[in-house]
């Protein structure tokens, strides 16, 4: 393996190492979600995936992303690092907010705007719907990070949340 001092033979300094970790973690997450036809950077491109999606398929897709976020060693360790360090560094606080809140809310808001336009979702404020959809997921990930023994309970709550959201805001097409 690589010893800590030899890392500096490959990177200019601590910031370069950190930047490489950020880039690698984002790439791994994007590659995983792309296999599920979810592209957080391209809500418009994902509309065909979610237009007409069934409740069970949606719940399964969200569960897969949730479990990946919890159990991928790099993704999980990086999220936990940012969770702790956000209180010591304004830059890391901003990164945490962008990566785990703003980015996800913006993606879902754009996706929901398009799905409202196609008639898939009821006509409501897409930004509020996005907050309502994303926030419980983030909360449940936080619970699992702090209390891993509650994972099964959180997965049940995640499924119940996604299914309730679907039944509440999905238009029944005849």
Regions found by a protein language model. Give the residues of each.
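Amphipathic alpha-helical packing segments from all-alpha helical-bundle domains
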Residues: 33, 71, 76-83, 90-117
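Residues in soluble alpha-helical coiled-coils and helical-bundle/repeat scaffolds
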Residues: 12-16, 20, 70, 87, ...
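Alpha-helical structural segments
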Residues: 16-64, 95, 99-110, 156, ...
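A short secondary-structure junction motif
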Residues: 28-32, 36, 40, 89, ...
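Amphipathic alpha-helical segments that line or abut small-molecule/effector binding pockets
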Residues: 51-71, 76-84, 127, 131, ...
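Helix-turn-helix
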Residues: 1-24
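Hydrophobic/aromatic-rich alpha-helical bundle segments in the mid-to-C-terminal region
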Residues: 94, 98, 102, 112-163
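C-terminal effector-binding regulatory domain of bacterial HTH transcription factors
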Residues: 167-174
């Amino acid at each position: 393996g690589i010893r800590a001092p030899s890392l500096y033979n490959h990177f200019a300094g601590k910031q370069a190492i950190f930047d490489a970790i950020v880039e690698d973690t984002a790439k791994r997450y994007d590659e995983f979600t792309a296999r599920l036809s979810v592209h957080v950077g391209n809500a418009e491109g994902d509309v065909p995936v979610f237009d007409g999606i069934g409740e069970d398929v949606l719940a399964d897709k969200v569960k897969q992303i949730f479990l990946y976020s919890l159990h991928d060693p790099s993704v999980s360790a990086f999220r936990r690092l940012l969770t702790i360090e956000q209180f010591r560094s304004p830059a890391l606080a901003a990164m945490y907010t962008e990566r785990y809140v703003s980015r996800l809310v913006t993606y879902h808001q754009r996706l929901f705007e398009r799905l409202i336009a196609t008639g898939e979702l009821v006509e409501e404020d897409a930004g509020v719907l996005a907050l309502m959809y994303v926030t419980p997921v983030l909360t449940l990930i936080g619970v699992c990070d702090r209390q891993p023994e509650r994972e099964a309970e959180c997965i049940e709550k995640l499924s119940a949340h996604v299914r309730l959201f679907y039944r509440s805001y999905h238009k029944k097409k005849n």
